[in-house]
């Protein structure tokens, strides 16, 4: 039986790259996202190589998620790997200058959405057992604070701790859980964070070498295909040209 991967946020960035990486290895694909036209285009690219099932899905709606999982067609029901990739960052300015609605949007997607999809697929993953894998896409922002990270960083800290706690609950089932925490990566993610400001997005990467979506997709595939007795609890990935910075200190003028 062909291995099957369920990818959220598959229409761009890490998710899209992961779809191509897993397809290259012959996996069946369940691809989800909110933009149906992009899902259809991606299916068109891949379906000649592997079986592809697409779902226009808002992960924030638990009823919709449950119904989508319950309705998976034959050939896509035994999900071996879940890539919880859907997520976003908004409002990179200081917390006191943000709109509360942006905070709720990040929480609803990065936390509630991830929980919804995980809960819906846990019975399937447990049934698959040994070698089944959940890859939760976190961020270095979930471990290391920086200005403008506020709710985004906190949501990714949740992803990290949820992954650890889930590992404890799933002990003995054979299901593995990894918090995959990327650093700076040049994807559409940054354009969303800057509110569509292409110049601001480009400026973040100018003069350096960021991670690519394909770099992270390769790590996703590596985690999913490790020997069944091996689990990465957390994998933090930065480009070579990124590191931590000094503490911020408020000095008198």
Curated annotation (Swiss-Prot):
Enzyme class name: oxidoreductase
UniProt EC number: 1.1.1.313
SUPFAM superfamilies associated with the record: NAD(P)-binding Rossmann-fold domains (SSF51735)
Known pathway: Organosulfur degradation
Family according to the record: Belongs to the short-chain dehydrogenases/reductases (SDR) family.
Function field: Catalyzes the formation of isethionate from 2-sulfoacetaldehyde in the deaminative pathway of taurine. The enzyme is specific for NADPH; NADH is not a substrate. Responsible for most of the activity observed in taurine-grown cells.
Protein name: Sulfoacetaldehyde reductase
Native source organism of the sequence: Chromohalobacter salexigens (strain ATCC BAA-138 / DSM 3043 / CIP 106854 / NCIMB 13768 / 1H11)
Taxonomic lineage: Bacteria, Pseudomonadati, Pseudomonadota, Gammaproteobacteria, Oceanospirillales
Gene: isfD
């Amino acid at each position: 039986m062909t291995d099957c991967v369920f990818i959220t946020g598959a229409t761009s960035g890490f998710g899209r790259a992961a779809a191509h990486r897993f397809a290259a290895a012959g996996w069946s694909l369940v691809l989800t996202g909110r933009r149906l036209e992009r899902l259809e285009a991606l299916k068109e690219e891949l379906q000649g190589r592997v079986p592809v099932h697409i779902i226009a899905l808002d992960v924030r709606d638990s009823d919709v998620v449950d119904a989508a999982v319950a309705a998976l067609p034959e050939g896509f029901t035994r999900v071996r790997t879940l890539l919880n990739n859907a997520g976003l960052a908004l409002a990179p300015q200081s917390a006191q200058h943000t709109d509360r609605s942006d905070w709720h949007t990040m929480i609803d997607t990065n936390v509630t959405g991830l929980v919804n999809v995980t809960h819906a697929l846990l019975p399937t993953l447990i049934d698959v057992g040994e070698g089944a894998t959940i890859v939760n896409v976190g961020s270095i922002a979930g471990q290391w604070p920086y200005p403008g990270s506020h709710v985004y960083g906190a949501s990714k800290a949740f992803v990290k701790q949820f992954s650890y706690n889930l590992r404890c609950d799933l002990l003995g089932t054979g299901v593995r859980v990894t918090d995959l925490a990327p650093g700076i990566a040049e994807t559409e993610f940054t354009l969303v964070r800057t509110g569509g400001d292409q110049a601001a997005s480009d400026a973040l990467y100018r003069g350096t070498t960021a991670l690519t979506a394909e770099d992270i997709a390769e790590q996703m595939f590596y985690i999913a295909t490790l020997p069944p007795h091996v689990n990465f609890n957390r994998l933090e990935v930065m480009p070579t040209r990124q590191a931590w910075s000094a503490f911020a200190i408020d000095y008198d003028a």
